[in-house]
Amino acid sequence: MPSQFFGLNIAYKGLLASNASLNTTYNNISNEQTEGYSRQQAVQQASPAIRVFQTYGCAGSGVDTVSIERVRNEFYDRKYWNANTSYGEYNMKQYYMAQMETYFKDDSTTMPGFKTIFDEFAVKGLQAVLTNPSSADTKTQFIGYAESLTTYFNGMAGNLETMQKDANDEIKSKIEEINSISSEIATLNKQINVIELTGSKANELRDRRTLLLDQLSEIASITTEEYPIVDANNPERETGANRFIIRINGGQVLVDGNDSRQLACVARTAYEKVNQTDIDGLYNVIWTDGQEFNLYDRTLGGCLQGLVEMRDGNNIESFSGTVTATGKKDVTDDKGVTKSHDTVTVEVTKAYLKDLNKCNLSDNGGKIKLGNQVFYYDSWSYTCSYDANGEPAYSYTFVISDETLNDRNLTNDRVGMAASVGESIDYQGIPYYMQQMNEWVRTFSQKFNDILNSGYDAYGASGNNLFSADHATDGEQYAFDKAFRYDLQKDGTMTVDMTDDSYHRMTAKNFNILKAMVDDCNLLATKKKASDGVEQSDLLNEIKDMMNDKDKMGFRGSTAGEFLQCVLSDVALNASNANTFYKNYKNIAGSIDTQRTSISGVDGDEEAINLVKYQNGYNLASKMVQTLTEIYDRLILQTGV
């Protein structure tokens, strides 16, 4: 039979088990408000029974506290991370689209926008000149309204550039945050393994790691996996340590056990710009070990994807075409040195590439992908040619940079391959709205100036342009020579170089009034014939018709004055979608977090009940000790020998 002191050992184990449960409850209560803390519980099991060689076989030996485990459901963690990733993406989009709405807003009293300014120019100002074309005051006022229109677009371009800079800076901030979190998780992995190799559970460290994963999932989409490390000499024996891996961006490893990979932001140089309207210094992201990090991967997710799509979104209107020819061209640089460069001609079929007014290719050079090879290019030219049947064909010829930028020569095997510049991003981000403004100012200025050029001013001289564009450096203005007007071409072939004096050089940022017109309002053409008197204003009627007839000057199927309506519809739709998805995913993430908190969170009422339960258990174990004390007293002191 078991020893008479066997019961004392059972009571002792009961005291230990109840004490462990009480201490765990104390810890839970203390951390009820601690962010990321998971409720813990003492896992107990019956001690191995002892064989006593009696009819009842075995005698129970009490209870053992096996471990203190955290209560956590990884299924809800993963669901939360997925929802949090979408929440992060639309959080960024709704923030920036709200700004965009504010910029395009038109409030005639507090914040005059396009419609107010355009109506003053096209209705009030134009009507005054039509009524009194000989008056210098009315013409000066009209030119002033035109200048207000150019100032509006200058300001809008500046606002969008600021937005692009903010998004770019925030991308860098998020990359630094990823690096910080990944380094901390790698350190935690090491600390967790050090503790768990001894057989204990690193509950608090695991909670800290999960909290960091919550933060990381908002920045980018993540996947995790954890599996035990086994003894190399005995694969069936687990060492107690685990290998924890985090992957982002379509499966690229960010953290592997104790090691973390770091990302770096590299500013694009002037010759690496993608869009004509891009600000300098936009960041590309790479791994510090030299491997590529695709910032445009659709699986990127989170705040990063929202920021990238806002910064670079072009509504899938990037440059693309098919290589039709390669060649050579002699190019003379700024120092007068002539050198032969490779060229590649790319035929385009998309409507937005056929019209140079819609083109957003960088005028500082860039990178072009030909098949699976990437080349730097210095310049490009646009060609429109008509065949014998009068059918037009459109192509772009790129002058490839020399060996200082390219580590390979262009070969003829690229012919027939796909060519592209930049990425096609399925979102209407800042480049899209910049391109929309550029298209409008180019098309409107072109039509407006054409009418003025066909008439005569107060001096009887041929009409001048009203709208111009400033050079970036020397303070001069573009003249927009008709020799580069491909839209007036009916046959043959015309080539427009990116440096030529074409309307492609005009952007919302450099849009301006002809300086000479500001100095002398009488240069404004108002009549169709030089012999007509100063009161003649028939030319201005053509301008009025042009601004109100979408067949004479159309923008996306609307009249010139409906520009804001077209663009604002895009902004409103994107802002509405962003707000809707932001609220939806915020609610979904909150709902999932509530579900997982119901499992892993601390409930004060439940812990209060546990306190009473474990206290009773402790009291009963103490009662066992007291009872056994009385038994031993009778057995040892009062039993006669």
Q: Which ranges hold each PLM region?
A:
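Structural signature of extracellular appendage/secretion-system components
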Residues: 1-641
